[in-house]
UniProtKB/Swiss-Prot annotation:
Stated name of the protein: Cytochrome P450 2A2
InterPro entries, A to Z: Cyt_P450, Cyt_P450_CS, Cyt_P450_E_grp-I, Cyt_P450_E_grp-I_CYP2A-like, Cyt_P450_sf, Cytochrome_P450_fam2
Entry GO terms, CC: cytoplasm; endoplasmic reticulum membrane; intracellular membrane-bounded organelle
Gene: Cyp2a2
Catalytic activity: an organic molecule + reduced [NADPH--hemoprotein reductase] + O2 = an alcohol + oxidized [NADPH--hemoprotein reductase] + H2O + H(+)
Amino acid sequence: MLDTGLLLVVILASLSVMFLVSLWQQKIRERLPPGPTPLPFIGNYLQLNMKDVYSSITQLSERYGPVFTIHLGPRRIVVLYGYDAVKEALVDQAEEFSGRGELPTFNILFKGYGFSLSNVEQAKRIRRFTIATLRDFGVGKRDVQECILEEAGYLIKTLQGTCGAPIDPSIYLSKTVSNVINSIVFGNRFDYEDKEFLSLLEMIDEMNIFAASATGQLYDMFHSVMKYLPGPQQQIIKVTQKLEDFMIEKVRQNHSTLDPNSPRNFIDSFLIRMQEEKYVNSEFHMNNLVMSSLGLLFAGTGSVSSTLYHGFLLLMKHPDVEAKVHEEIERVIGRNRQPQYEDHMKMPYTQAVINEIQRFSNLAPLGIPRRIIKNTTFRGFFLPKGTDVFPIIGSLMTEPKFFPNHKDFNPQHFLDDKGQLKKNAAFLPFSIGKRFCLGDSLAKMELFLLLTTILQNFRFKFPMNLEDINEYPSPIGFTRIIPNYTMSFMPI
């Protein structure tokens, strides 16, 4: 038993340590960007509208400025709002902001592997390898263009089979876009009714729905506790295991027929690199292969299909815009050949429409979180190593000095007085800096080729009055989603 004197010393020492830690944290807070005062554990939860986090952040930026601090639960986040702050951080101080921020909902699946690697240098090598491999398999080149056009052909046949009946096009778009990345990752496409393919799309959809749900948002804030509690997150854990098992089996199939001298797809290329780098600390191992492949599937399925889904709705709401795109397709491409990606250089109006669809949709306004990789000073504020940063890409898309009347859908945002395509510095749908979207060139090609191929063959028809179309995405937590709708594809 401790005597009273010794016990008193222990208590005083403990209190002193607690005081010093509190003092140190207070000094850090004083040097951090300003922001609303957080409550213990729940942070700024009560000050955020969890149904529309982007609007809450916009309101906070009006009070605290373009650089401020919020707490999502116990997690401290530095927010960058507006073009100047985002560019200064991600371009001018790119190295300091090059870490990958935490996405707890998707970490359920990726577990810190693949593109979620916490080791910055290993993450860079995986990323460089992936970009090089995507290029090897034709991303940005004619090889992948042929793949996209092949899928577009299957989609056209499917839509022709609807005979103009009203349908919800979302599942058709998901199948088409997913098959493009499937061809790169697996080396083959799936039949649209393949049960394994449909199961894969369903699981990806379940993950995305969970991430956007109220439970998913709470998990992002309080994952350290919620991962042990009953609830929808436990079902998602089962879904992630099925996804992992699916990919492990695909890797096993590839490995059994691997020719080191002739890689057929992304998985083959990674397996060959694994054989070349067998040292203990190499980042080229099975976990990173499985999770990098899954990461490509997620990135390559959702964004483009959702953008097209909203694009169809916007073109029906604005038939004058659709008519001008049809006219440009007729004049530049005609009806006797398939569109080619090089056509976009001669089709400024169509490209402006695609850009404006992306800008107006603004489906992931909060962007991908970054992480400070070393103690950094930014605009006079101290950002400690390990701080997560939200560069609000959506704020760039609505900045009035770049996009006057930004609440309106207007392709003129991207056209000059002569009707030619003009660059807009704030149009950064794929982000910027060292963590920009590695599939941006593939996405640009898909958007142009799929939209022009569809409009070369069909006119869009809404089954009700145009006034009934709600063209604005609905805010759901950290994201925005497109209202479900039906439409008819009328053959030309």
